[in-house]
Amino acid sequence: MSKKESILQAATWLFAKKGFKDASMAELSKMTGAAEGTIFYHFKNKETLFLSILETVKLTIINEFDEYTAKKQFKTGLDMVEEVISFYLYMAGHNPNLFMLLHRHDAYELAEVNPVCREYLEDTYNGLVNIFERAVNLGQEDGSIGAMSARKTALILFTLTDGLVRFNSYNLYNAGALSGELIASCRRMLINV
């Protein structure tokens, strides 16, 4: 692993645990063994480093979802919705730092004043909602999902799923303990009757 990759990996953990505001470059330097000058050689400032991480988070999450949905054969759109929910919960459980980073409030405060930060966050969430929307559209085409606004329904499905992940991220409730109920509730909401 290159020094730059090592810095990115450690900084991802640090920003996930402490947030953008409270993470310090001195602490990152200590964690990686890289001098602060080396960190600033690779990344102009703390904000640039954070934006690099957000871009990596976006690409990682969306690419993993794209790979997953490309290799899966879904019987129906309703089955795809259930699988996407399950995979989202799986990803959040296996990559907790990525999701904790997205759930930290200070990223959104930065997005208010930094258009690149806002773009990365919007692209990440739009990419995820688009996956849910594809599943809803597929279900409406095959008849497994009733007639409703695909985009609005995708937003609701994503919000339900991500809300459960947030509980898990903040150690309030184990997302896995409710995954079956979440999927069953979404099925009841969507099924074409």
What are the roles of these predicted feature ranges?
Residues 17-21, 95, 142-143:
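Short coil/turn segments at alpha/beta junctions that flank glycine-rich nucleotide-binding fingerprints
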